[in-house]
Amino acid sequence: MEKIKKFNTQIASHLANNLENSLRELRRCGAHRSSKATFTEMGIQLSGFKNDLAENNKFNALVGNAWIDNEADYYLPAVMTVDVQRQEQEVTTYVLNDHGNNQRVIMYLTGGAYIQRPDKTHWQYLNRLAIATDAKIYVPIYSLVPHDTYRTAYQEIASLYSKIYTLMPASKVTIMGDSAGGGLAAGFCEYLGKKGLPQPGHLILFSPWLDLNLTNPLISKYEDKDVTLAVNGLRKIGTMWAGDTDHQDYRLSPLYGNLDQLRDVTVFVGTREIMYPDVTLFVQKLRDAGIAVNSYTGRGLFHIYPLYQIPEAKGVMKRVVATINN
């Protein structure tokens, strides 16, 4: 009983500090974050994922659970209203909203720190995305740590992408990704450029993980504000994901890759998350390389905020729809 009380006190203290810091930042920048965004951020904090990454015993449990979960058959949460088909090829892939060959296509790479499969929030967002865009959406359940490294995931995604662009012009394809999936999407597009393969018409990223080692010194200023991610835990997962490959390889850290072949990039990031500094740097590098890029910063908002059902995400959805249908 004493242990539970201690835990609850700790969580309450963190929540109070988080709310106080949030209000202070909003007053300073003059933004007006919705109350729903504030309560959503609290819910994310209560989920405990950041603690799972930050604390050694919880991190070990996270990896242990992943050994079991990531080898088990994947079951889709019962939240979808659009048509869903499951394809078993090189990689298990869910195809959403397929009703013809004239649709635009999205290949969406879900985040989860390279250790967790897509969760309910992902599928709720993807359902809304399918309705808003009327696009056909491919969602591969790509391989993750601790069983596999990025090499397996790249093979799976490359196989799926090649099948997609043989069915339609690559210009009608959009690659999207959030968090780790956003880093994977960016690295994969750099890989396409290196291999001389066709780029998608659009690349849309939500809070992408762009440097596997998270070495930017500015990140330390944002870690306390970030209710989702902890640097040390991500670095340990990154080591597993990389295998024997240098962590600055563009497939792992697209921030350091050749950006010249990318086209029409759109990036969203919040100011209360550790990915913010590297996203800012990535956008500047894209502009320096002459790549068309649109960057949107959610002031006072959290990691992958566009995926959540908050008022601030509605404007993001409109921009995503306009980009995909352009």
Indicate residue ranges for each PLM-predicted region:
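Alpha/beta-hydrolase superfamily serine-hydrolase fold, recognizing
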Residues: E88-Y94, N101-N326
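A glycine/proline-hinged amphipathic helix-loop "lid/cap" segment
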Residues: M1-G100
